[in-house]
């Protein structure tokens, strides 16, 4: 698919690839035949989506600092308020576990405004809608995933050039922080998990998508002609790799 302004955060859901185009901004779904549909127009960018266990879509509207929920009638309602969690509120990436816990991360500074660097963190929004910070001190938190057993959360630290893992407690808290993979010169952005528990990560400055196992061993590399911001596995057997690739000109081009 071409003509995407700035594609981010792909997810395979109900036999289609869903992703956010931060340009308009909007959420789009496309099937394997290339037929696409604009699902909704987002209030602002960055915007990212995932689904609750009951199938309702969650959407982060970063500018407002809100986690929104799409109801069956198509309306968007507030699921959680992130404005009190950190400044700026998190809004870069979203992942939901099988219990309905939503994790939202973000850097500790406003990159789009050229603010001075500060490390970021991860917020938890419970199924009841309460929000709190559950991890901090991550240089630049980016892509996230939760393992199928709901036991581990893995986050890409772009500035730290590593994948960091946490154990997920029964109340959604994160503990036992550890480096899951040191990526050397790799700069991870969006990530996804495959059937062998290896992780694919998009790499913007190195223009590639890389598959690594725990510990950092590189298993496979797909070279591209532009920055790879995110990736997802989908298709009938969840083995087709989809990559969101964009010619990156800096954050000022997104304003």
What are these regions (language model features)?
Residues 1-16, 42-61, 66, 84-109, ...:
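Beta-rich, blade/repeat-based domains predominating
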Residues 230-255:
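Blade-level signature of beta-propeller repeat domains, shared across WD40, Kelch, NHL, RCC1
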Residues 166-173:
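Short loop/turn segments immediately following beta-strands, especially the blade-tip
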Residues 26-28, 66-68, 113, 120-123, ...:
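A short loop-to-beta-strand structural motif that recurs across blades of beta-propeller domains
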Residues 22-23, 62-63, 109-120, 158-161, ...:
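Short, solvent-exposed loop/turn segments at conserved positions within beta-propeller repeat blades
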Residues 30-31, 70-72, 126, 167, ...:
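Structural recognition of the beta-propeller blade-terminating site
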Residues 1, 34-41, 76-84, 130-136, ...:
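A short beta-strand motif characteristic of beta-propeller blades
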Residues 15-40:
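Beta-propeller domains
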